[in-house]
């Protein structure tokens, strides 16, 4: 997937089997509270919540495509029973990830752009299906539709 090269964070569902084990000594209390609070909501409530909530676990993953150290968060907009319950997030190109990144001040790196021009001060995710690759190393200048 062309987007994953510039994933700036990862999110697990609060009920994911690894969620609690990813907490560090510094984040354990907040992580445990978040897991508990999320367990009190139904999946319907979680998907309808207008405001994104989450907690940083204190742990990181390594992005296999870029080698970048990627922070791991928990958020109840990810559900354990949908897919794997874990997602790599490219907030420049997904509305929910964009809202989450804006709220928690997580970097947003655009990787697909119309006519190869990066949007300055993004106010929403760029969700067009195709465009020119930017901020993507060897893929810069390539059309996303051929990757």
Task: List the predicted regions and their residue ranges.
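Residue-level signal for pocket-adjacent positions within structured domains
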Residues: 13, 17, 50-51, 74, ...
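Generic beta-strand/beta-sheet core signal
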Residues: 7, 12-13, 64, 72-75, ...
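Basic, alpha-helical terminal appendages of large translation-related enzymes
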Residues: 7, 12-16, 25-28, 105-121
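Catalytic-site beta-strand/loop segments enriched in glycine and acidic/polar residues
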Residues: 59-98
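Conserved small/polar residues in nucleotide/adenosyl-binding loops
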Residues: 2-6
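Amphipathic alpha-helical
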Residues: 13-56
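Short glycine-rich loop/turn motifs
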Residues: 7-8, 56-58
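Residue patterns forming the tRNA-binding/recognition surfaces of aminoacyl-tRNA synthetases
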Residues: 1, 86-147
